[in-house]
Amino acid sequence: MRSSAKQEELVRAFKALLKEEKFSSQGEIVLALQDQGFENINQSKVSRMLTKFGAVRTRNAKMEMVYCLPAELGVPTTSSPLKNLVLDIDYNDAVVVIHTSPGAAQLIARLLDSLGKAEGILGTIAGDDTIFTMPASGFSVRDLYEAILELFEQEL
């Protein structure tokens, strides 16, 4: 089996185990993965995977402290580049709309507001995962749209 295919299989198995919400230690996760045929797995690899996928320890329904994945996919982490938090950018005759990962809209809006009128931004309104951006005087909505695309390195 190819290395990348084996890695994808490991990631699927790892995520499936965490969804069970019954593992209270990294050692338990290592043993469960080894039982599934991942002989080369060790505690340090499990630790790195827990960090990579944003796993946290929380109480399950039985009030036991267990590892689990965040409820929302796409939750921002300290290592998320901002451009990865922007999912979609679109516009109409009046406004540019930016869709972000859940919880990231206010962070992205603050960045856009800090760029200000020099970049064509009059202001932003942010919810949890959606931002409305208004163009400043002298800028068209299309100009603002293209500037934001360039900022977040998105494709037209």
Curated annotation (Swiss-Prot):
Ion transport is among the record's keywords: no
Q: Which gene encodes it?
A: argR
Broad class of where this protein is predominantly found: cytoplasm
InterPro entries (UniProt xref): Arg_repress, Arg_repress_C, Arg_repress_C_sf, Arg_repress_DNA-bd, WH-like_DNA-bd_sf, WH_DNA-bd_sf
Species in which this protein is naturally found: Salmonella paratyphi C (strain RKS4594)
Q: Name one Pfam family in it.
A: Arg_repressor
Cellular compartments annotated: Cytoplasm
List the coiled-coil residues. Answer: none
The family annotation for this protein states: Belongs to the ArgR family.
Q: Does the keyword DNA-binding apply?
A: yes
Q: What is this protein called?
A: Arginine repressor
Q: Which GO terms describe its molecular function?
A: arginine binding; DNA binding; DNA-binding transcription factor activity
**What is this protein's function per UniProt?**
Regulates arginine biosynthesis genes.
